[in-house]
Amino acid sequence: APAGRKGGDSLALSIVREYIGEQTEVRCCHFPMSADSAEKEAVWDEVAAALVQEVEAGKQVGFITLGDAMLFSTWVFLLQRIGNPAWLEIVPGVTSFAAIAARSQTPLAMEQQSLAVISCTAPEADIAAALRQHDSLVLMKVYGRFARIKALLAQAGLLDAALMMSEATLPGEQCWRRLREVSDDQPLPYFSTILVNKQWEYAQ
């Protein structure tokens, strides 16, 4: 199970803990949120090698993750190292933005609409271009970047077509439907995402 802090609990593990049998061995792995590529790659190498070693020893091994394992997930860096062995099965998950769409009753895309999933770590010019080009957008990794993204939405005239949700489906879930009223320095949880649909009227 991945853990955001060394020695800390795993959010993914807390969600599935009640379904884990007493005989199941659980290991939490700290994946550093660091700009140091060498540090991160060393951890990915170590965890991937340990996972393969356990499987080759005859054990059934699972790696749990939040959302879908193939979208903005630490798992993909392990997958690069593991390859495509016959024993590997990846179970589809529910993406955060699919959960947000359901919780907010906001469609992601309809009929001929285009849908773009954008990381807010992208250059501002790329985000601005995406806001112009697409009918519906998912803006992920908003944490620490809200003021910049809010300004881009305002420039595009899309503040009223957007909503933001944090920690969707979790006990701390929060939703903001009027982004123009949200302060630029509003404290946000790490898991915060913005949905934009230019052709949908939100219930107030």
Label each region the model flagged:
Residues 2-6, 94-96, 113-122, 142, ...:
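Short, acidic/turn-prone active-site loops that include or flank metal/cofactor-
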